[in-house]
Amino acid sequence: MVMEELERMLLKHYSGSFSYRGLRYLLPVYHTHLWKVKGKFMNNNPLLSVADVRSYIENYLKQLFAEPIAIVTNNGKYLLNNAISFPIYDFWNKDDQELLNDFENYSFRGDYIGTIFFFLSGYWEYTHNNIKDEYGRFPSTESFSCKKGILEEPVVDILVERIREELGFTYKDNKPKAFITHDIDHLWLPTGLGFWRSLGVDILKRKDVKLAYDRIKKSFTKDNPWSVYNLIEMHKKDGTKGTFFFMPRKQPKVRWAGYDVIENKEYLQNLGNEIKSVNGRIGIHYDIDYLKENRMKDDIDRLSSIFDTKIEYGRAHYLVFDITRSFDIYEKAGIKFDSTCSFSDAVGFRFGTSKPFRPYNFVENREYNVVEIPLIVMDDSLQSSRYVNLILDEKLEKIKQIIDKV
């Protein structure tokens, strides 16, 4: 099967996050930030300093390299271990056009340290956060990476590797890893109105008549392609580990997803036991309205009680994400690992890296106590209009191209 082939390919040589439902057939301008915090923002932009950038990136590199590393500043340069230096580029004092013009060969005028901060912190997205799509998400087309045509380039990883080579360092952990995840939008094949709506999505949105036909054919058999047990069996067969994100409640009708976790408590508990039997993780698929409703902690507690396990992993439904608010919500709710940060309509490196990292808190000038595991490839992303003309084999090839870059 395509999914099984893809999983093995990922595990062979990939460090990053990959998501497929298993329940679908893969392949199935001016800065105008809208709010201020006294003393932290100027002209609607984060008030940054060279010291902020230096400290954050020094901590980041310490997590990656086995050898000690120290960054100091002197005469307009970042100096690493008194061995190599990079000119300081104060990107926070530049306008959009300057940033776009000054970025060449994966850096802003040769400043590797500032460039790594720019991408890891999501600075461009943070300062353009008023731009939203119909679901309140920042569009990939408005990202700096998309405007420069580098969304499929792991800029941070490229620069870190250059630094490692120049210093002659080694990585603490250089073994390939795949973070395989499943968003459990549904517990089984939809029926009734939900079934017909899914056919409409297949035909009108995904432009995939064959997928709709297969869905109809499956509805007349006992073979349920939406069964979570199918995913569990796949992990059991291949000896792989998966993370399963369960929804905490039914979603609004226009979002068509979710289920009553109390009503399906026994079924979910049985699922949870099976997932644990293959060393899988159980996480939360955040309510689509989590940015509007102050209930994530309650949702986590509900799932934790049902599955009798601590819920520390999460991802947002529809990849709903607001860089000015989401990390705060995750941190306060007790989420330790999030894997939301990808664009719904494009594969690639939203934060410039395939590796886990701690996001930056612009308000308090510190790292969040949350690890972001970048979502690099999601099945639905390859159903977007950007890839509409690609056939199945070409979509697999697109994923292989991404893998070869990390």
Where in the sequence are the language-model features?
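Active-site lining segments that contact anionic ligands and/or coordinate catalytic metals
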Residues: 279, 346, 368-370
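Terminal accessory/targeting
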Residues: 1-263, 353-356, 362-406
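Conserved, mostly hydrophobic/aromatic
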Residues: 183, 285, 314, 330, ...
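Catalytic domains of cell-wall/extracellular-matrix polysaccharide-remodeling enzymes
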Residues: 14-33, 289-366
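Metal-dependent polysaccharide deacetylase catalytic core of the NodB/CE4 family, i.e.
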Residues: 186, 190, 210-211, 229-321
